[in-house]
Regions:
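Hydrophobic, aromatic-enriched alpha-helical segments typical of multi-pass transmembrane helices
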Residues: 1-243
């Protein structure tokens, strides 16, 4: 089956987001009998029981995922730029670019920061045996990174979600009816996490653990809309299929 260069780039981005999901599970998922208690804002007692290899692989998934994330979202931006040519539409394309470039720059760092915070807590406790002191040190590391983390969240997750919802309901994306637009409105990190992710938390273990990957899955679903856009653009002759 023939596959366009554009389609392969979008799929590469989806693979990158899938690596994010795997990394999120490795970092945050807990066993049925593990403690769900937290110390301070971000430190979970369960980190003490987690194998170090989980954090190492999680960081690797974050780094590799970021490279593939850029490939996919850069391709979707190029499609949007080609498809949306009116001045009022172009401002949303620009905001989409700001959002995905923020993600490219920051998500690898953010992912590594969270996992390193867990490792600092784990290793400090193993060395000195003081859980409260270890948690205090780890939380201080988080607080030092809180400002860029919040900025990344606003400029990528929030902005990307707003842009996608606007594009959907202003009919900038080729969706055929209201039902498709309602379904597509879930295809972003904020709505998918806020609704679907929170619903998973109500389920018994291990289904409740699915919540940990829903933010990254929301980014993956944005690229799924990119595949829909590419398909319709090819039908209309807006972009020619490139076969290698």
């Amino acid at each position: 089956m023939k596959s366009s260069k554009e389609k392969r780039a979008l799929i590469a981005g989806m693979i990158g987001c899938s690596l994010y999901v795997i990394g999120d599970f490795l970092f945050a998922a807990t066993g049925k009998t593990q403690s769900t208690e937290s110390i301070g804002l971000m430190v979970k007692v369960a980190y003490l029981d987690m194998a170090t290899w989980r954090m190492v692989v999680s960081i690797i998934c974050g780094v590799l995922g970021t490279a593939l994330y850029y490939i996919g979202f850069h391709q979707m931006w190029k499609l949007l730029k080609r498809h949306l040519t009116q001045p009022k539409q172009q401002k949303w394309v620009k905001l989409f670019q700001i959002a995905y470039l923020t993600g490219t720059v920051c998500w690898g760092y953010v992912h590594a920061m969270f996992t390193n915070m867990a490792l600092i807590f784990k290793f400090t406790f193993e060395k000195y045996g003081d859980m409260q002191a270890a948690a205090e040190i780890a939380n201080k590391v988080f607080y030092c990174n809180a400002a860029p983390l919040l900025a990344s969240y606003i400029l990528c997750d929030v902005l990307l979600s707003v842009v996608m919802i606007v594009m959907i309901w202003k009919k900038m994306l080729p969706l055929k009816n209201t039902a498709q637009r309602i379904l597509a409105s879930f295809c972003n990190p904020i709505v998918f996490t806020g609704i679907v992710g929170n619903l998973f938390t109500l389920l018994p273990w291990p289904l409740d653990q699915i919540d940990h990957g829903t933010e990254s899955a929301g980014h993956l679903l944005v690229l799924a809309l990119g595949l829909v856009l590419l398909r319709e653009m090819m039908k209309c002759g807006e972009c020619k299929e490139t076969v290698q």
